[in-house]
Amino acid sequence: MTSSSESTRKGLTKIATNRLQKEFMEWQTNPPSGFKHRVSDNLQRWIIEVHGVPGTLYANETYQLQVEFPEHYPMEAPQVIFQHPAPLHPHIYSNGHICLDVLYDSWSPAMRLSSICLSILSMLSSSSVKQKPKDNDHYLKNCKHGRSPKETRWRFHDDKV
């Protein structure tokens, strides 16, 4: 287990629980366009369906995100990973890890899961190529099985795709 996985098993703080219940209710009434929450009784782990935007490389494609909320959410960012198969994208590794600054260094407690989802959809929609990251094989080789992407020291060097 990773430290991030272990922290999600500790349970949520009262602040995190209240915030997630509020976000859950918002998702029930007005989910972000292109996303659907799969019903679960686990407030800490959500499965989100991502639907590709018409007119983009990912049109008519559906992917699944696994979102794990840490015990101190929203003070800490959730862990967001594409489940297999992950989309072919220059910022999405074959193991589902996503190189997107709002999931790591640029996270703010004012953000919500819906803002992360919109960033992911924007990233997918603006891509001009379907390909793995250039360092995909190297990353997978050095990424221990089950390791949280939050343990990675990401270098955000390209925001063009």
Curated annotation (Swiss-Prot):
> Which keywords accompany this UniProt record?
ATP-binding, Nucleotide-binding, Transferase, Ubl conjugation pathway
* Pathways per UniProt: Protein modification; protein ubiquitination
- Kindly summarize what the UniProt induction comment says about this protein's expression: By biotic stresses.
Instruction: State any GO BP term from the record.
Output: protein ubiquitination
Give the matching Pfam families: UQ_con
What does it do? Accepts the ubiquitin from the E1 complex and catalyzes its covalent attachment to other proteins.
Task: State what protein this is by name.
Answer: Probable ubiquitin-conjugating enzyme E2 17
